[in-house]
UniProtKB/Swiss-Prot annotation:
Pfam families linked: SNO
Recorded catalytic activity of this chain's protein: aldehydo-D-ribose 5-phosphate + D-glyceraldehyde 3-phosphate + L-glutamine = pyridoxal 5'-phosphate + L-glutamate + phosphate + 3 H2O + H(+); L-glutamine + H2O = L-glutamate + NH4(+)
Protein name: Pyridoxal 5'-phosphate synthase subunit PdxT
Gene: pdxT
Gene Ontology BP terms: glutamine catabolic process; pyridoxal phosphate biosynthetic process; pyridoxine metabolic process
Subunit structure: In the presence of PdxS, forms a dodecamer of heterodimers. Only shows activity in the heterodimer.
Organism: Pyrobaculum islandicum (strain DSM 4184 / JCM 9189 / GEO3)
Associated pathway: Cofactor biosynthesis; pyridoxal 5'-phosphate biosynthesis
Active site residues of this protein: 84 (nucleophile), 184 (charge relay system), 186 (charge relay system)
Length: 202
């Protein structure tokens, strides 16, 4: 099987290693490629969109012609994981905890509303064990994380958390072949990447 990691910026190498380790645990042989141009998407069975800076991802995706290619591939059913900034990139509704509505280029594919920087800046990093729907308990690493506040259509929110200002928020979302996490699973667990590989096998 071939998996891809969108390699415009963010923690690309960590996702590559997480896919490799997940495949090893599942007994699947895997090749993981860095997705940098539209034709790379034709080769892969599943995709991870890493964290980093969501406005940068959007701008670079637009410039490289990947924005439309990604949107088309994911719409056609490519199992896709978006983590942290990658989750913001997948969402239909994005606002910033400080500046309100953002006009950044996004894929706009998941029926979820996301608040950027909901947990403040870098110093607001923390780890916690979370119940993430059918994935069970996951060790979640949050770094300048967003928060999911609403879902509609057939999107489902998971991993509930209490936020000091926003109240009840969620750190994961599922919709068909798409998964979004506010945390960085690639830093602490293979559970989420195994889930993506199993989706790709179906």
């Amino acid at each position: 099987m071939k998996a891809g990691v969108l390699a415009l910026q963010g923690d690309v190498e960590e996702h590559i290693q997480a896919f490799k380790k997940a495949a090893q645990e599942l007994g699947i042989s895997i090749e993981v490629i860095q997705v940098k141009k539209p034709q790379d998407l034709k080769e892969i069975a599943t995709l991870a969109i890493p964290g980093g800076e969501s406005t940068t991802i959007g701008a670079l995706a637009k410039r490289t012609g990947l924005l439309d290619a990604l949107r088309d591939a994911i719409k056609e059913g490519l199992p896709t994981l978006g983590t942290c900034a990658g989750a913001i990139f997948l969402a239909k509704e994005v606002r910033d905890s400080v500046v309100g509505e953002t006009k950044q280029p996004i894929l706009g594919l998941m029926d979820i509303a996301v608040v950027r920087n909901a947990f403040g800046r870098q110093r607001e990093s923390f780890e916690v064990d979370l119940q993430v729907g059918e994935l069970g308990t996951v060790r979640a690493v949050f770094i300048r994380a967003p928060a999911f506040i609403k879902a509609w259509g057939d999107a489902r929110l998971a991993a509930p958390l209490k936020h000091p200002e926003l109240g009840q928020i969620y750190a994961a979302a599922f919709q068909g072949h798409m998964v979004a996490t506010a945390f960085h699973p690639e830093l602490s667990t293979t559970v989420v990447h195994k889930y993506m590989l199993n989706l790709a096998k179906k």
